């Protein structure tokens, strides 16, 4: 079986991006990192430059711009996107777009369906209970009244 070479686009910043870059290096995977102008001297940019050189860095205007992130993925020849946490890690629409567009990429994380289903904490709690998984005490529905929230908290 032929080994597929992958290049991972790291779509995050800070410590999580540093860890993803280090993991890619350890696994022998190529990587590219995005960064904003404000983050040019941050840790993830320094380590990406150190381990991958200038070609591993792409400046973006925002970590939240899906179009720009996907454009960088295409320009860099990335085959996968690692969202880290926050930003796109919890956005099922982004994960779905990554994996269903014409130039499909691997989304490193849960499937978009899982993100969609478990992204709502109330639905997640209901699902856990239905499967017999213990949950913390509290409400199974949204609380809009401060007095009710205090009552449940006691």
Residue ranges and their predicted role:
Residues 1-154:
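N-terminal beta-alpha lobe that positions the nucleotide/phosphoryl donor
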